[in-house]
Regions:
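Structural alpha/beta surface segment adjacent to cysteine/selenocysteine redox centers
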Residues: 30-31, 35-115, 119, 185-203
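N-proximal helix/coil linker or "cap" segments that precede and/or mark the start of modular domains
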Residues: 1-9, 184, 190-192
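C-terminal cap of thioredoxin/glutaredoxin-like
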Residues: 45-49, 111-203
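Residue-level signal for beta-strand positions within conserved beta-sheet cores that form or flank
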Residues: 25, 56-58, 151
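A short beta-strand-turn-helix
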Residues: 10-27
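Short gly/ser/thr-rich secondary-structure transition/capping motifs
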Residues: 9-14, 134-138
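Soluble periplasmic/extracytoplasmic beta-strand elements of cell-envelope proteins
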Residues: 28, 61, 154-156
């Protein structure tokens, strides 16, 4: 059996990225995502659980990959997240958008902005002026040409592309393998979940 090709991240995480968790964390999980993508929507609670279980042992990074042809509202949703980020509320908006990804119209975005506590005048101005559009499009171009991202979610763990299922068991296994120094001690809840999920998969 041939060994799967290892695909490495070319554009490393920088201060421009939206990152949650310490830079010193032993594992960094990066997601290329799309707020309108149903697969990303399904992955969202799984990734949230991974982040909760690992705490400061994980750094989570999100990069936009809107696909307007198949997800026509994904680009405006990405702009809304960036506008929220300019007011230090990126992650709050990130959660709102994924929780309500079936409702991403202009009025919906404004409502979520109010819900997370943004300055609504500033948010409306940034959205009307497409303040973050060029940045999102440039990042998308780099994702396509440098990383060869073709769909979402695309996940990297410690700069190596993850090709398994986007479920808790698979991600925790991959994170454990990526923790070369053995610094992560999975909490009891994570170990229990891995055992239960493993039994379920085996039937």
């Amino acid at each position: 059996m041939s060994t799967p090709e290892v695909v490495r991240l070319k554009n490393s995480v920088t201060e421009r990225d939206h990152a949650s968790g310490p830079e010193t964390a032993p594992v960094t999980l990066l997601e290329y995502g799309n707020f309108e993508c149903i697969h990303c929507g399904r992955a969202h609670p799984v990734l949230k659980e991974v982040r909760k279980l690992l705490g400061d042992n994980l750094r989570f990074v999100f990069r936009h990959f809107p696909t307007v042809r198949t997800h026509p509202r994904s680009l405006r949703a990405a702009e809304a997240a960036e506008a929220a980020g300019a007011q230090a509320k990126f992650w709050e908006m990130y959660d709102e958008l994924f929780l309500h990804q079936a409702a991403l119209g202009e009025n919906d975005l404004s409502r979520y902005a109010g819900r997370v506590g943004l300055d609504l005048e500033r948010f409306a101005r940034d959205m009307a002026e497409n303040r973050f559009l060029r940045q999102i499009e440039a990042d998308h171009e780099r994702s396509v040409f440098d990383e060869h991202v073709t769909g979402t979610p695309t996940i990297y763990i410690n700069e190596v592309r993850y090709t398994g299922a986007t479920n808790l068991e698979g991600l925790l296994d991959a994170i454990g393998r990526a923790d070369a120094e053995g610094r992560i001690q999975l909490p009891e809840r994570a170990m229990w979940l891995r055992r239960v999920l493993g039994r379920l998969r085996r039937g």
